[in-house]
Amino acid sequence: MGESEKISVGIIGASGYGGVQLVRLLQEHPLVDIVYLGGKGSAGQTYAEIYPHLGHAVDLTIEPIDTEAIASRCQVVFLGLPNGLACDIAPPLIAKGCKVLDLSADYRFKNLETYSSWYNKDRSDLDTAKTAVYGLPELYREEIKSASLIGCPGCYPTASLMALSPLLKQGLILPETTIIDAKSGTSGGGRQAKTHLLLAEAEGSFGAYGVAKHRHTPEIEQISSDLAGHEVKVQFTPHLIPMVRGILSTVYATLRDPGLVREDLLTIYSAFYRSSPFVKILPNGLYPQTKWACGTNLCYLGIETDPRTDRVIVLSAIDNLIKGQAGQAVQCLNIMMGWEETLGLPQLCFYP
């Protein structure tokens, strides 16, 4: 499709944090027209009632979820629903010719048994799931171009895989030594009321959760195994930090060649991501901060080696709601439609 014709887009699950980021980004996208916002509990409310700060720009009402009506009005549909719901909605939309981008975990896995064991939901949409492409453009750009269904990655996997991928693809590390230590702001937990996300609980505190059992673990392992060419298991531990948005993922692994130095790895990473406009490789001795990525679709990577332990340390900073969610979905849309990959996506952060 050329860059002169707007496409009609719908968003199901527009009332959550991922949904409002999609609305913000797509509202300013030059080749997109938002024609439908859908939801269950919020149906009947105007979008301005839910998010008053967008009332001057978005004159739409949340509508019931009706796949027949959606397919008749939308060429592309974004699904910003809780895990386990998209797999019931995506198949009929795709059957009617819509392109679908799912922000939940439903279409991230090649093996649905893995999904079912971690997300406690049996699946009957095997044929649809087989067509899904994992929506990490820096790794699967060519596959995304011809896809009709995108399983958009989770926020932690995005940050972690951006740091880890060159090491695995080039065979530079012993994969079984991989440790991922990641920290996220509270918006990663969604907009629903949860005790541990209350200001009184989160402020001034910092702790791990989902230790040895976080659902993003098998997602990271699936892509890591794909890159390495054999099964890879990683040690992944997420932490909640008292800020609204941002992820910092620190990846540790043992180098196969202890003689590799930071300058070697900077060259390797720069070559690996040479066609990736949102990846910023930091120079010697500079390490990323989450604020640098805030509000953008950028991923900052800092690299270090420790000759004392023969380990490589890679730090990755993203905005969990943009590159880790809505922005990456829009990036995939641009690729699917044959547009400039950066179209409508911010590259300048909110600062300070």
UniProtKB/Swiss-Prot annotation:
It is found in: Cytoplasm. Keywords: Amino-acid biosynthesis, Arginine biosynthesis, Cytoplasm, NADP, Oxidoreductase. One of its GO terms (biological process) is L-arginine biosynthetic process. Its main location: cytoplasm. The keyword Mitochondrion does not apply. It catalyses: N-acetyl-L-glutamate 5-semialdehyde + phosphate + NADP(+) = N-acetyl-L-glutamyl 5-phosphate + NADPH + H(+). It is an enzyme of class 1 (oxidoreductase). GO terms for molecular function: N-acetyl-gamma-glutamyl-phosphate reductase activity; NAD binding; NADP+ binding. GO terms for cellular component: cytoplasm. Pathway: Amino-acid biosynthesis; L-arginine biosynthesis; N(2)-acetyl-L-ornithine from L-glutamate: step 3/4. InterPro entries: AGPR_AS, AGPR_type-1, NAD(P)-bd_dom_sf, NAGSA_dehydrogenase, Semialdehyde_DH_NAD-bd. The active site is at C155. Pfam families: Semialdhyde_dh (PF01118), Semialdhyde_dhC_1 (PF22698). Its EC number is 1.2.1.38. CDD domains: AGPR_1_C, AGPR_1_N. Catalyzes the NADPH-dependent reduction of N-acetyl-5-glutamyl phosphate to yield N-acetyl-L-glutamate 5-semialdehyde. Belongs to the NAGSA dehydrogenase family. Type 1 subfamily. This is N-acetyl-gamma-glutamyl-phosphate reductase. It comes from Crocosphaera subtropica (strain ATCC 51142 / BH68). The lineage of its organism: Bacteria, Bacillati, Cyanobacteriota, Cyanophyceae, Oscillatoriophycideae.
